[in-house]
A protein has these predicted regions:
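Structured adenosyl-cofactor binding patch, chiefly the S-adenosyl-L-methionine
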Residues: 145, 160-172, 233-279
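RNA substrate-binding interface of SAM-dependent RNA methyltransferases
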Residues: 63, 111-204
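Active-site regions of enzymes building and remodeling cell-envelope glycoconjugates
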Residues: 80-91, 122, 214-217, 236-237
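Amphipathic alpha-helical repeat scaffolds
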Residues: 54, 131-139, 251-259
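Glycine/small-residue-rich loop that forms an oxyanion/phosphate-binding "nest" at active or ligand-binding sites
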Residues: 84-108
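Active-site/ligand-binding-proximal alpha/beta "capping" segment
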Residues: 199-251
Length: 279
């Protein structure tokens, strides 16, 4: 009888342990207020954090160089001291997406140095007031695909840690360094250092007939007005993406993210056929 009693006590103790291990935590009002604050750039700057959502992205974040401060997740997705298990209704209250995700992480915003010497042998994108979060997120993803590790943005460009941008990058934000600076000053320094500064213009040279450098700066302009006069003054090579067939009147312009994809593809195509393909 004593043995049976001990077995019952052990079963009860194990059951309690399992319950404590898997029990849902109580999400506080402060948690919700913090996540809501991080939807705004001012809040992200104040707290030094950004929001990432979804099991795949958060899984990548946990193995990256970025610091994950806290994870809110449905039961069974993640484990660790930074993980708080919440229910579906709580996730719906927390999520910044239209359709609530199964997990949300608070991640420390990284700070990268911008070294012109390090960029000398690479292809780098420069964004002149690209303001749509979806466009910026797509461009970061394109940069990652084409092996471009740095994007230099004007200070009026969209914030790369905006939740919409983070989601649109599909994890590429972990591998591409995005810098914000006085773009005109940066481009002047690049030109003075002898780096080719290329940009897309309607009066530019047909990109498919141009001999493109393996390394340099590629400037992409604002969604509405294109490349500003200040940035254009530093461009040493004007390029043009022609329509097909040549001279046909159709759409007035290309979406900046689409144009960036075409330009990057042609730069990398030429690098892979004529050079080392390492820029």
């Amino acid at each position: 009888h004593l043995s049976i009693r001990r077995q019952r006590q052990m079963c009860i103790r194990d059951s309690r342990r399992n319950h404590l291990h898997h029990r849902k935590t109580t999400m506080t009002k402060a948690d919700i207020q913090l996540v809501r604050a991080l939807a705004d750039k001012r809040g992200r700057t104040e707290h030094g954090l950004f929001v990432a959502e979804g099991e795949k992205l958060i899984g990548e974040l946990r193995t990256s160089h970025l610091g994950v401060r806290k994870i809110f997740a449905l039961e069974g997705l993640f484990s660790g001291p930074e993980v708080e298990v919440v229910g579906t209704k709580e996730m719906e209250r927390l999520s910044l997406l239209k359709t609530a995700s199964n997990s949300l992480a608070l991640v420390e915003i990284p700070h990268y140095g911008l070294d012109m010497r390090a960029l000398a042998g690479r292809l780098t994108l420069a964004l002149d007031d690209v303001q749509n979060p979806g466009n910026l997120g797509t461009i970061v993803r394109l940069a990652d695909w084409f092996g471009i590790t740095d994007i230099v943005c004007s200070e009026a460009s969209a914030d790369c840690f905006n939740p919409k941008v983070v989601q649109a990058t599909m994890g590429a934000i972990l591998r591409v360094r995005v810098h914000y600076t006085d773009l005109g000053g940066f481009l002047r320094q690049a030109a003075d250092a002898g780096l080719p500064v290329c940009g897309t213009f309607l009066e530019g040279e047909n990109i498919y007939g141009a001999s493109l450098p393996e390394a340099g700066i590629v400037v992409m302009g604002n969604e509405g007005r294109g490349i500003s006069d200040a940035a254009a003054a530093t461009v040493t090579r004007k390029l043009f993406i022609p329509p097909y067939p040549a001279g046909r009147r159709g759409s007035e312009s290309l979406n900046v993210a689409m144009a960036t994809g075409i330009v990057c593809a042609e730069f990398r195509r030429q690098a892979s056929t004529t050079g080392t393909g390492q820029a």
